[in-house]
Design a protein with these regions (language model features):
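Short intrinsically disordered coil segments
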Residues: 73-78, 112-120, 151-153, 263-264, ...
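Conserved, well-folded catalytic cores of nucleic-acid-processing
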Residues: 2-3, 40, 44, 122-125, ...
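A short, sequence-level motif marking secondary-structure junctions
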Residues: 58-66, 151-161, 260-264
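Catalytic micro-motifs at enzyme active sites that drive phosphoryl/nucleotidyl and oxygen chemistry
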Residues: 21-22, 29-31, 81-88, 123, ...
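Charged regulatory segments coupled to nucleotide-binding catalytic modules in large multidomain enzymes
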Residues: 194-311
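GHKL (Bergerat-fold) ATPase N-terminal catalytic module, capturing the glycine-rich phosphate-binding loop
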Residues: 1-102, 108-109
Length: 311
């Protein structure tokens, strides 16, 4: 359609951005994809010790006028604006705001619900840190959210509300209903714990001789028996197979496409097909692999947001 045509049309300047390898964290600036959402971007940012806010105003149409013009040669509007307590939420003295407008498409309730469901998968369900939270605020949906709360119907669940802080409560649902294997890998040792419906079965502590590059890895795997699948579907409003399988997080952020519906980046389904009753596939397992590392060279993500890690 026309949207796909626009994407193809604009690929050239996006590719130039990616190839420059200007990283925002472990990603290129193309990761933000603001131009796909709207026609303009107003970025406002301030440090805690600054007295003013820095602001840039980007008109994406300027990048499309001449595909041969390098993006570094295209001017964007820059200004400094006075700071006041109303600039950032909760009267914060620092922060960054990305204001995208006008939007390229209409965001109705169903689209916002899909956004919420996608964002909850970005939240590491077993992270012990509170570095940040994601909250959706959409005033026009307040009344409908209140109506959803009044329904005494299992069809309407917490995930159907648009407004509020996004949480990933998957592991709370599964914790006491199935068999779980937890693995912690440090530079010196590997600690494996088997838990069955909340009870510790056994622990194994081994010397880490095989994985010198892994010094802070946590793995949680859950076996999806029938009870776990039924409970998951009832609480989440979606079957586990359609939600995803084993997700990968690097330094607290999710790495795509690991865990996506139909994705076999872990090779589970391939191995399961090699023999009967010998291996578990993505339909049978749910969980996460969490890697914390400063070694971005060995665990570098590809420039595409859904390309996984560089092999």
């Amino acid at each position: 359609g026309s949207e796909d045509a626009d994407i193809i049309k604009n690929d050239s300047y996006r590719d130039k951005i990616k190839n420059k390898r200007y990283y925002a964290g472990a990603k290129g600036i193309g990761r933000f994809s603001c131009d796909r959402l709207g026609k303009r971007l107003i970025l406002t940012t301030k440090t805690s010790d600054s007295e003013t806010c820095e602001q840039i105003n980007v008109n994406w149409s300027k990048f499309e006028e001449d595909q041969h013009n390098e993006f570094v040669n295209i001017n964007v509007d820059y200004s400094q604006i006075p700071y006041n307590l109303e600039v950032f939420p909760d009267k914060s003295t620092h922060g960054t705001i990305l204001d995208i407008k006008p939007l390229n498409s209409t965001w109705d309730r169903e689209k916002l619900k899909g956004l919420k469901h996608s964002l909850e998968k970005l939240i590491n369900p077993v992270s012990n840190t509170d570095d940040f939270s994601i909250e959706i605020i959409c005033e026009r949906e307040f009344e409908e959210d209140r109506s959803v709360d009044k329904f005494d119907n299992p069809k309407y669940i917490d995930r159907d509300r648009i407004n509020g802080v996004i949480k990933n409560s998957i592991l709370d649902i599964l914790n006491l209903k199935t068999t779980q294997i937890d693995v912690q890998i440090t530079k010196d040792e590997i600690l494996t714990t088997v838990i069955d419906r909340g009870d510790n079965i056994y622990k194994i502590r081994e010397i880490n001789r095989k994985y010198p590059l892994l010094d802070d890895v946590k793995i949680s795997l859950f076996y999806l028996n029938r009870t776990a699948k039924v409970n998951f579907t009832r609480r989440m409003g979606i079957e586990p197979v359609n939600y995803g399988s084993i997700f990968l997080f690097k330094n607290g952020f999710r790495v795509y496409p690991f865990g996506n519906k139909g994705d076999d980046s872990w090779g589970l389904d391939y191995r399961a097909q090699q023999g009967h009753s010998r291996f578990l596939g993505t339909r049978d397992l749910f969980g996460k692999v969490e890697i914390n590392t400063n070694n971005n060279f060995q665990f570098k993500e590809v420039s595409s947001r859904d390309g996984g890690l560089v092999e």
